[in-house]
């Protein structure tokens, strides 16, 4: 009879299921995991330190690059902290736009998570379906900011610009003939709000497609049910937030418990799980996409009926419009000062947190009364989840390790910062 041996091996950082540059030192007894030691820091870019050497308005772009799948949600946390220090409130239309794009970002994140999670476990079709829908939502990003990912769209006091009246259209190419392009452009004939409305009308049926492939699939359930279980009490002790905490049965969502933007004006439900396993995390995120779709439709209805300003009218914080700057000397001076030294933030400290797709994303800023922050501390949502890897994986098979990693939904941009 062959002897069962203990091994210690490296998982990652170059591994397709590592979701970035994750390195795990895994100790196994035969094929059963005994201990896991996560090693982080391979994607460290000193974002918090960089923020100390840049004016406040130049750090917004760094936030996009932390969790680079939840771009605008990261920006939201940062600008909320600045708004607290400045004592300003964005216009109500800007709040609704932020709420709408936070939920678009949530769907973008969950679609990538679902596709990658399914692919890690061995289901390829869902991955292709999810990326089909992500293209439409990235077009929304591009319409308001010109960028498909790193938008830098939120500003202290509002958003960069109002929603456009037209959508970018596809042109015939080597990959898409005229017939295909015509079909793709059907929903792009109107405004951005028309395009989003069309998407939200189609999206629930598309979620049903994903569920028909996975939810009752025997192999999917064998790979996820009872895997990586964390109880509600233990999840709270470990500092879990977001879908990871809600899957364990704790009804905690900052959008409901500490409302920001326009979340106190829209109607939605918080999905929670019971078992705290990989399967419950999947079900919670699927239902979150349905609730996000519901929130987006409410925002579109309100935005259609209520035009108005999307950023405060204060030249000491917000640059004047180009046509005003060209003819008014005082506006030109404000414009020059804002783009050279930025704005001065009063001395003090502020913490702002948002319900980012992965959990609570918090930004703590200390100001010494200058145009640059004295200290910026980012609370990454995925950090406590990765720290609990040893506890979640102990006693499971090596194959279950991949399912647990992908159920956490980690992005190393925010963990390593």
Curated annotation (Swiss-Prot):
PROSITE patterns: COMPLEX1_49K (PS00535). It holds the Pfam family Complex1_49kDa. It comes from the Bacteria. It is found in: Cell inner membrane. Its EC number is 7.1.1.-. It catalyses: a quinone + NADH + 5 H(+)(in) = a quinol + NAD(+) + 4 H(+)(out). Its main location: membrane. It is a peripheral membrane protein. InterPro entries: NADH_Q_OxRdtase_suD (IPR001135), NADH_UbQ_OxRdtase_49kDa_CS (IPR014029), NDH1_su_D/H (IPR022885), NiFe-Hase_large (IPR029014). NDH-1 is composed of 14 different subunits. Subunits NuoB, C, D, E, F, and G constitute the peripheral sector of the complex. NCBIfam families: NuoD (TIGR01962), PRK06075.1 (NF004739). Belongs to the complex I 49 kDa subunit family. NDH-1 shuttles electrons from NADH, via FMN and iron-sulfur (Fe-S) centers, to quinones in the respiratory chain. The immediate electron acceptor for the enzyme in this species is believed to be ubiquinone. Couples the redox reaction to proton translocation (for every two electrons transferred, four hydrogen ions are translocated across the cytoplasmic membrane), and thus conserves the redox energy in a proton gradient. This is NADH-quinone oxidoreductase subunit D. The gene is nuoD.
């Amino acid at each position: 009879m062959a002897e069962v041996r203990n091994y210690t091996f490296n998982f990652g950082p170059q591994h397709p299921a590592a979701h970035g540059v994750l390195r795990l030192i895994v100790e196994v007894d035969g094929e059963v995991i005994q201990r896991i030691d996560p090693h982080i820091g391979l994607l460290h870019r000193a974002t918090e330190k960089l923020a100390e050497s840049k004016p406040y308005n130049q750090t917004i772009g760094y936030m996009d690059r932390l969790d680079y799948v939840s771009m605008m949600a990261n920006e939201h946390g940062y600008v909320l902290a600045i708004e607290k220090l400045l004592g300003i409130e964005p216009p109500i239309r800007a709040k609704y736009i932020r709420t709408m794009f936070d939920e678009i970002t949530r769907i973008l994140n969950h679609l990538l998570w679902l596709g990658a999670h399914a692919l890690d476990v061995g289901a390829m079709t869902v991955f292709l379906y999810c990326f089909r829908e992500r293209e439409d939502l990235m077009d929304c990003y591009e319409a308001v900011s010109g960028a498909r990912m790193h938008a830098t769209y939120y500003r202290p006091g509002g958003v960069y610009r109002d929603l456009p009246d037209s959508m970018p259209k596809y042109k015939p190419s080597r990959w898409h003939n005229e017939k295909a392009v015509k079909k793709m452009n059907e929903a792009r004939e109107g405004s951005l709000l028309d395009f989003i409305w069309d998407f939200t009308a189609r999206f629930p049926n598309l979620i049903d497609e994903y569920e028909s492939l996975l939810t009752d699939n025997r192999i999917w359930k064998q790979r996820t049910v009872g895997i990586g279980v964390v109880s509600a009490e233990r999840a709270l002790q470990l500092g879990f937030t977001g879908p990871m905490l809600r899957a364990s049965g704790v009804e905690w969502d900052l959008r409901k418990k500490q409302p920001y933007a326009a979340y106190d004006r829209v109607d939605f439900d918080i999905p929670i799980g019971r078992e705290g396993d990989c399967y419950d995390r999947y079900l919670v995120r699927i239902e979150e996409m349905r609730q996000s779709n519901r929130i987006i439709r409410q925002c579109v209805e309100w935005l259609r009926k209520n035009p108005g300003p999307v950023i405060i009218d204060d030249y000491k914080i917000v640059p004047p419009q180009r046509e005003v700057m060209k003819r008014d000397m005082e506006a030109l001076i404000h414009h020059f000062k804002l783009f050279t030294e930025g704005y001065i933030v009063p001395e003090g400290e502020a913490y702002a947190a948002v319900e980012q797709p992965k959990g609570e994303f918090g930004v703590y800023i200390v100001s010494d009364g200058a145009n640059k922050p004295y200290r910026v501390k980012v609370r990454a949502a995925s950090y406590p989840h990765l720290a609990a890897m040893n506890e979640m994986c102990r006693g499971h098979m090596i194959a279950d390790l991949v399912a647990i990693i992908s159920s956490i939904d980690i992005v190393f941009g925010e963990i390593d910062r």
